[in-house]
Amino acid sequence: MSRIRLGVAALLCVALGATVTAQDKATFALKLEKDKAFYQKMSTTVTQIIKVQGQDLTQKQDSTFFFKWTPDKQDGDKWVVKQKVEGVVMSIDISGNPITYDSTKKDQPGSAGNPGLMDFFKNLDGSEFAVTLNTKDWKVEKVDGKDEFVKKLGAGSTQMDSLLKKIMTDDALKQMADPTYGLIPDGPKAVNDTWEKKQTLNLGPIGSYDVTYKFTYKGKEPGKTLDRIEVAPSLTYKAPTEAADGLLFKIKAGTLESKPLDAGQKPSVVLFNATTGRIESATISLKLKGDLTVTIGGTDTKVELEQTQTTTVDGSNDSLLPGATPATPPTAPAPPKK
């Protein structure tokens, strides 16, 4: 009898231990409500040092996209969410020659030297897509609106239209419409749990990228209720295998690989808000280094490339456009009691 009691007690201890362990695991459930919009601001800073025939060419690019997401309809684990580009801010500096565009301002400085690029930026603003999201594994399964998007961006430029039709693959569009969903764990996690996610981005005649994210759940952010996930991203480039018909160049060969971050780059971190059921903020930083062999006019040219890139994403229940009116006005403080 005593052995039976000990056995029952042991089983109870195991059951209680399992319960405690399950309770200690953080859950990451996306919370969507039909027609209740939420917003994101995605900013990317890229610095490239390109060496060609012994000469260095430095290019800097800053881009900010303002997104509005509106849940439209649900079918089991799948949601169709409407995505709209509410605003675009771009700044490109090629060896001291700046090009800027800001859709949030009425008066644009213009760019007489590259009006086609300015038109491209303008056409990005207001673009809309219907994104089908599987909430079980956080994968974007489908994006509707590609044909209209490519037609809009390529308007007025045969060369741009040809390039976009080749590089704007279904995979490329899915990843463009997926700034944070792929960073969310697809199950409960305990402190110091680790996991991986892999993606392949195929850009047709530009080549493809294999991306690996290694995640570690670190628990609650100190002093906050946000869940902290640290990320170690890595990327490997593969040269294209298909012909670059209609393009002025062809990437014949190349290798690009991730390297340790520069001292000034921010570490990659995701902060998840369990209350809103969305990512509060995310930072993903990369450094790449390698070389490409580019064929132009039948001549092969070796290009050495070093690139640093940092992308930040911020989420909100209100539009993040400058000067936007909050959907829910702040409540005035109660008068002091007499």
Where are these regions (language model features)?
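Bacterial N-terminal signal peptides
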Residues: 9-17
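Sec/Tat signal peptide C-region and signal peptidase I cleavage site
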Residues: 18-22
